[in-house]
């Protein structure tokens, strides 16, 4: 995963459109924020009036006036509470909705990314980006516009009122603000860098834990618990070091703010006292001045405290953008059409291919014709490109040169959904989703009737063993199907393809990991599955492909032998050597 870095301006520009759907809520949130701010700024004015009037002529200050001011302030407090409730409720809901929208966009984009992306990216990193990182965006989306809006209002109004009370003193106070902001911006930049490292390390830690837990059987089999603990401790220790650095920057940040807080209070205390002694500011004005300065400093402190949340949110947005900006390498052409009822005739015309991260060509000018309904087996040494060849047909990868035709048309002319919808794949490493057997079979055709699911299971030879289970089709298979045997999982995956009912079948070493009994049952199911369909079979067990219409021997030099079993045995070439070696091992 490319860890591209974005400027703050670019992050705001990319994030802002997510507020578009919630403009009314945002405007109401800011309006309520303005109300709470105004309510808060009225109290010092009331205190100023009472103090000045009391010192000027205590007898003129009636109880009625004080009660009137008290009722006014109480009314403003009620307004403040109602506005605050809206901010806390609807404002946070808006943030949660934006987080949900971003997570949806990230997940939808991940669905479109090619195998190359997943080959080069740790799942733990991806999980961290679409879960933990976006949690911080909820608070950021709510508080960021609100906090800066409130700060802007309070700063402007406070400056106007303070300047009206005593301009020289106000200028002294506000001279401290640019200096404080400059220092804080430097520390903010360092905090952002630390938070970025922290998030990356969390992803590495998640990937380490996931890898170890998924491979727990291998860990136990090799008694390597201590080795895994050492790896974990190393990654965990790195995370701690990064977090220490983050807290160090945060401590420096908070200390700087407190220092400037004290400096501003000191200016008011000393300069304000001198102005009062010289009669340039009234006592009531100085009281109000202190209250407004306290409000101003509290606002600045609130923004400073928000800085940590701000940096977390910006880091979360940045890591989100690194997902949605990942290039989609396999996509529909602008004029792509739906593939309907294909016959299944496949042609490779001068196909060359190399993986994006490896410049060594797997194929060079490969030509191959597969007739509709033909059963073709592909054998050869490991690393010869058998699986790669089959992965090119459903466009899990695109050819580097040449083209692949389906029924005489370039496969790129068809939409990915319709192309892959007409191809069924049974792999050696069966992946079952966490859920029931019924849910896993119906994955082949979502929305299929129960009768169709059961019929697919019967044709795959899975129905009998399913019914022997306590919960039948409602049996929970566990994560990746761990509660089932290899043969059972394979037959469920075959049932899934039966339900899909595609005209083209790819069998990628579908029986190589099974015992003899399971292989016999699965081979029978595969035989029925391939009947009447264009079938490509990759196999190491040559006994499973003897009845293929045609067998191809694929090596680094391309297709070096071709024919049925008897023809290849007569040639006494590579296939003959493979077959004799397999028999000798038996």
Feature locations, PLM:
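Alpha-helical transmembrane segments of multi-pass membrane proteins
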Residues: 31-32, 76-95, 146-153, 174-198, ...
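Helix-loop-helix
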Residues: 56-68, 161-175, 245, 249-318, ...
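ABC-type nucleotide-binding domain
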Residues: 332, 339-586
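Juxtamembrane loop-to-helix connectors within ABC transporter transmembrane domains
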Residues: 11, 19, 87, 91-95, ...
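Hydrophobic alpha-helical transmembrane segments of ABC transporter permease domains
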Residues: 31, 35, 39, 43, ...
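Short intracellular "coupling" helices and adjacent cytoplasmic loop segments at the cytosolic face
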Residues: 2-5, 96, 104-128, 132-134, ...
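Transmembrane helix-loop-helix hairpins at lipid-water interfaces of multipass membrane proteins
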Residues: 26-86, 163-168, 279-283
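An intracellular "coupling" helix at the cytosolic face of ABC transporter transmembrane type-1 domains
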Residues: 24, 115-116, 132-141, 145, ...
């Amino acid at each position: 995963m490319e860890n591209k870095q974005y400027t703050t301006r670019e992050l705001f520009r990319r994030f802002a459109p997510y507020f578009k759907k919630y403009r009314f809520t945002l405007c109401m949130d800011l309006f309520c924020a303005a109300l709470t701010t105004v309510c808060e700024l009225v109290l010092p004015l009331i205190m100023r009036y009472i103090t000045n009037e009391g010192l000027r002529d205590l007898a003129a200050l009636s109880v009625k006036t004080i009660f009137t001011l008290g009722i006014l302030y109480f009314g403003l407090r009620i307004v403040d509470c109602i506005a605050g409730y809206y901010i806390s409720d609807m404002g946070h809901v808006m943030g949660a909705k934006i987080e949900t929208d971003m997570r949806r966009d990230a997940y939808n984009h991940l669905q479109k990314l090619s195998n190359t992306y997943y080959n080069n990216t740790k799942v733990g990193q991806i999980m961290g980006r679409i879960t933990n990182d976006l949690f911080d965006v909820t608070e950021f989306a709510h508080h960021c516009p609100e906090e800066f809006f409130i700060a802007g209002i309070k700063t402007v109004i406070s400056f106007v009122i303070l300047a009206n009370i005593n301009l020289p003193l106000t200028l002294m106070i506000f001279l401290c603000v640019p200096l404080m902001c400059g220092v804080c911006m430097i520390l903010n930049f360092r905090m952002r860098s630390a938070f970025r490292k922290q998030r990356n390390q969390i992803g590495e830690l998640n990937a380490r834990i996931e890898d170890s837990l998924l491979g727990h059987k291998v860990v136990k089999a090799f008694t390597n618990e201590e080795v895994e603990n050492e790896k974990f401790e190393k990654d965990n220790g790195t995370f701690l070091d990064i977090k220490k650095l983050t807290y160090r920057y945060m401590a420096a940040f908070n200390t700087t703010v407190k220092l400037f807080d004290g400096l501003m209070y000191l200016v008011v205390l000393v300069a304000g006292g001198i102005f009062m002694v010289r009669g340039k500011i009234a006592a009531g004005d100085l009281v109000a001045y202190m209250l407004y300065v306290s409000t101003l400093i509290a606002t600045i402190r609130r923004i400073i405290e928000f800085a940590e949340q701000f940096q977390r949110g910006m880091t979360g947005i940045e890591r989100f953008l690194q997902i949605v900006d990942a290039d989609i390498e396999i996509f529909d052409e602008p004029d792509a059409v739906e593939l309907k009822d294909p016959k299944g005739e496949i042609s490779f015309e001068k196909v060359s291919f190399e993986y994006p991260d490896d410049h060594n060509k797997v194929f060079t000018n490969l030509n191959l014709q597969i007739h509709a309904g033909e059963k073709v087996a592909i054998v050869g040494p490991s690393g010869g490109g058998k699986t790669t060849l089959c992965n090119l047909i459903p466009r899990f990868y695109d050819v580097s040169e040449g083209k692949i035709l389906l029924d005489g048309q370039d496969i790129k002319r068809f939409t990915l959904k319709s192309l892959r919808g007409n191809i069924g794949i049974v792999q050696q490493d069966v992946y079952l989703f966490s859920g029931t057997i019924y849910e896993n079979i119906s994955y082949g055709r979502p929305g299929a009737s129960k009768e169709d699911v059961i019929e697919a299971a019967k044709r795959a030879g899975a129905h009998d063993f399913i019914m022997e289970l306590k919960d039948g089709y409602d049996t929970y298979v566990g994560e990746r199907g761990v509660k089932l045997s290899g043969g059972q999982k394979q037959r469920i995956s075959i049932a899934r393809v039966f339900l899909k009912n595609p005209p083209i079948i790819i069998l990628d070493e579908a029986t190589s990991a099974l015992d003899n009994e399971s292989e016999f049952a699965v081979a029978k199911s595969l035989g029925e599955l391939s009947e009447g369909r264009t079938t490509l079979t990759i196999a190491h067990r040559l006994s499973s492909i003897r009845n293929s219409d045609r067998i191809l021997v694929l090596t680094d030099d391309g297709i070096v032998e071709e024919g049925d079993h008897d023809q290849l045995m007569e040639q006494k070439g590579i296939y003959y050597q493979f077959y004799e070696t397999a028999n000798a091992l038996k």
